[in-house]
Swiss-Prot record:
The keyword NAD applies. NDH-1 is composed of 14 different subunits. Subunits NuoB, C, D, E, F, and G constitute the peripheral sector of the complex. NDH-1 shuttles electrons from NADH, via FMN and iron-sulfur (Fe-S) centers, to quinones in the respiratory chain. The immediate electron acceptor for the enzyme in this species is believed to be ubiquinone. Couples the redox reaction to proton translocation (for every two electrons transferred, four hydrogen ions are translocated across the cytoplasmic membrane), and thus conserves the redox energy in a proton gradient. It is a peripheral membrane protein. It comes from Phenylobacterium zucineum (strain HLK1). This is NADH-quinone oxidoreductase subunit D. One of its GO terms (cellular component) is plasma membrane. Its main location: membrane. Belongs to the complex I 49 kDa subunit family. GO terms for molecular function: NAD binding; NADH:ubiquinone reductase (non-electrogenic) activity; quinone binding.
């Protein structure tokens, strides 16, 4: 036998006498009832085998015309609409809207009101990240983290309820401050929770951070470079996971963030795993901020709402003694206050990214136009670009790392 090899058979489909078949692309619907869709998302996926070639997001299934509805209501009656946008962390959205109106009116918020706002913004951040991190783990097969995460979320929901009376749609922030002061017992309970929470985070990290399966499903999946993050208009963890140190709490401080000590976690690779690590570390930093707020709230006292009865209602006792207070109360709850004509943009570092409100006033008691800049919207529009070339199983991992809630996308 010589070392020569036999000539290869010609590359012809009919060598074996088989009919020639064309490989066709396969289209499937992902959602809107899929548990990994995180809401009413419908994705039409075009697959070549198991490789994703195209993703077409269909949105609008939760559209309620929020921006248009706001044009028919006085300013004070439009605050509850913001609770229903990103309903995982409602108070952060209220904050942006109140900031916009305060800019128009030139209202100064008392220090204690700013402290409470800062505290509850960070509670919202932890509520959001706990839900995102644990459900992302569930999407790739881990069932224990959601149980532990929801136990802590329940405690935070009770803090919401003790401050505002509602677990979810709080309607707690007001133009000029917050609706009512926090009792010292509540502040102490939040402080005690801050002491215990890092241990819970350690337990959750012990389950999934170095888990081989979790890393295989997230490392080098959905990579976003710095340039791509900026080009797509990303914000929040989506840019910080790619290594861009952009956080509005530092770069454009509002409330009392300029007086707080905290670090901004950054990723290196810009993949799903780095975004997960950023969120885990952000929860630790939020706990630090909450602890600082609790210490200051326990040591100080003062008003939580601006003492201007053209904007904030007078107290009940005052209304029984003063006719002016009664008139102010009546005018506030029937007509509301008027803002000077002009336009203003206010934004906050919401858990999902930069949540902005562009408010146009025509001098009446209602917004002429209120444009909401939802951080999840530019993230979702990049789904097609981020998923191309990935496997079908990676779609849910990428979607989970984007952190999408449909209240704010469809509005």
């Amino acid at each position: 036998m010589t070392g020569q090899t036999a000539p290869a058979a010609p590359e012809d489909a009919n060598v074996l006498g088989l009919p020639e078949t064309k490989v066709r692309k396969f289209n499937i619907n992902f959602g809107p009832q899929h548990p990994a869709a995180h809401g009413v998302l419908r994705l039409v996926l075009e697959l070549d085998g198991e490789v994703v070639e195209r993703v077409d997001p269909h949105i609008g299934l939760l559209h309620r015309g929020t921006e248009k509805l706001m044009e028919a209501r006085p300013y004070a009656q439009t605050i509850p609409y913001f609770d229903r946008l990103d309903y995982v962390a409602p108070m952060n959205q209220e904050h942006a809207y109140c900031l916009a109106i305060e800019k128009l009116l030139g209202v100064e918020v008392p220090v204690r009101g700013l402290l409470i706002r800062t505290l509850y913004d960070e509670i919202g951040r932890i509520l959001n990240h706990l839900l995102n991190v644990t459900t992302q783990a569930m999407d790739v097969g881990a069932l224990t983290p959601p149980l532990w995460g929801f136990e802590e979320r329940e405690k935070l929901m009770i803090f919401y309820e003790r401050a505002s009376g509602a677990r979810l749609h709080a309607n707690y922030y007001r133009v000029g401050g917050v609706r009512q002061d926090l009792p010292p017992e509540l502040v102490q309970d939040i402080s005690d929770w801050c002491d215990a929470f890092p241990k819970i985070l350690d337990d959750i990290e012990g389950l999934i951070t170095d888990n081989r399966i979790f890393k295989q499903r997230n490392v080098d999946i959905g990579v976003v470079t710095k340039e791509e993050a900026i080009a797509w208009g990303f914000s929040g963890v989506m840019v910080r996971g790619s290594g861009i140190p952009w956080d509005l709490r530092r770069s454009q401080p509002y409330a009392l963030y300029s007086e707080m000590e905290f670090d901004i976690p950054l990723g290196v690779n810009g993949d799903c795993y780095d975004r997960y690590l950023c969120r885990m570390q952000e929860m630790r930093e939020s706990t630090k901020i909450m602890k600082q707020c609790c210490e200051r709230l326990l040591k100080t006292s003062g008003p939580v709402l601006v003492d201007d009865h053209k904007v904030s209602p007078p107290r009940r006792g005052e209304m029984k003694r003063s006719m002016e207070a009664l008139i102010h109360h009546f005018k506030l709850y029937t007509e509301g206050y008027r803002t000077p004509p002009g336009d203003v943009y206010a934004c906050v570092e919401a858990p999902k990214g930069e949540f902005g409100v562009y408010l146009v006033s025509n001098g009446t008691n209602k917004p002429y136009r209120c444009k909401i800049r939802a951080p999840g919207y530019p993230h979702l529009q990049a789904m097609d670009w981020m998923n191309r070339g990935h496997m079908l199983a990676d779609v849910s991992a990428i979607l989970g790392s984007l952190d999408i809630v449909f209240g704010e996308i469809d509005r």
